[in-house]
């Protein structure tokens, strides 16, 4: 872990005016797992509230466990942490804590993943999960104008039958959450769980009119990115950094402007890259890909949106123009209606003109 921190901190510091520009930059977040925003302090508080015993004696001890070597070592802790989420209020509190941090980072719109199977497997009703998350998002929209949507994600280490069962359990809630629930995603352990494993359930979701996204090309090969596009018919690729290994795929991603929701600090923490200065984000951007910056599981990976932008700006020496391009790509890649999307793009233009 020390090496990772050093790989960011040894880079020459950013100019104060660029830091200020990044912090105020309007942003959209498109790759965020709500369960991955569970900070140790809240995790401990919820454990106490619900009488859940944790294998860690303190918040500090839990933070020390966040030294991951790969995706699986992170997932083991992630699923253990989710056990403290039991009531609608728990899901509300977690979601509201994320909103507070996001608004502080000038996130104007977020499309948020949630994993119902993580909770229904533990006996938590799917209605509880939807209700808690939605209550926080609706409250934030009404009080602060915080724009958001939710994407229900299937866990790829489980079976397609399980995904179908989850879909059928959730569909009766669709009308109630029509203002928020816009899409279907696919996440969890990529190795050994190719996209085609979920071809039928994604076809069904497509028939139902959901937007489709999938994690691909994080630890999995470029072929998984191609299969997510051609077999699952997704509109966005979550991660996708390994696409660079396939020049033909790179050309396609650039020509079709298929968005990649890249998560730099996540890639560093999970050892997808061993040094942020080696991250391929800038190369992907310069190759004409619709690259975006996101925080993934910020409580576990040490940074929300501003931290991710600051890390790549410093390590990759990105210019204001490149940073604005990343922000613009994200607004354009949202699943918002055209008018709402245009409004956010105008806000971005206005910010850039004023700064």
Where are these regions (language model features)?
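Metal-cofactor-binding active-site regions of metalloenzymes
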Residues: 2-210, 219-224, 231-236, 242-355
